[in-house]
Amino acid sequence: MPNPNSICAKAGILIGGKSQRFGSPKWNAKIGKTSVLDRLWDVCSDFEKRVVVGKSKPNQIKKPFLSDLTASQAPIFGLYTLLYNSEYKWNLLLSCDLPLLTKNLLKKIWATRDDQADIILPNINGINQVTCALYNKNLIGEVEKAIKNESLSLQDLVNESHVKKIAVESWNQELTNMNTLEDWKRIKCKEENKTSN
């Protein structure tokens, strides 16, 4: 039966980072009994298509997987791989740095899209959330050009694109960033306390 809440877009979850500050693959870190990747996969369940994007597919991952088209490390390569392999106009680029993301926030981002824009971008206190944003498939030429010019910052791509920014200060908790083991321990503790109350 069709999902009435279905989002006509593709979600790409990036697992490709080296996680040097974290010390192990972030996607496999557990919060409660669930890995970060599984949490984000569930959060994206309203999207018509979901895929994991990374350098090479770990044996533990049984989900649909796209291998990056280049071995270089930067989220822009994951974005290029996602757009290149997508049949959808809109594509969510999502990193495993955001384990507390919710369906409601993704619905808000989707509901505020503007078909004249290249990127639909959440913004908290002036900080762009470039790895929790919708990217238009039409942007692929600009992404390719940026890669050729070795301009590998997604923020630089944002600065050169037609962007719709969404103020999401009230969603600060959902966009908590997990970069270090200390971040993970803090998030894990908070979530476990929430479920035990």
Region locations from a protein language model:
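Nucleotide and nucleotide-moiety/phosphate-recognizing core
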Residues: 2-151, 156-175, 181-182, 188-192
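Long, low-complexity, intrinsically disordered segments
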Residues: 194-197
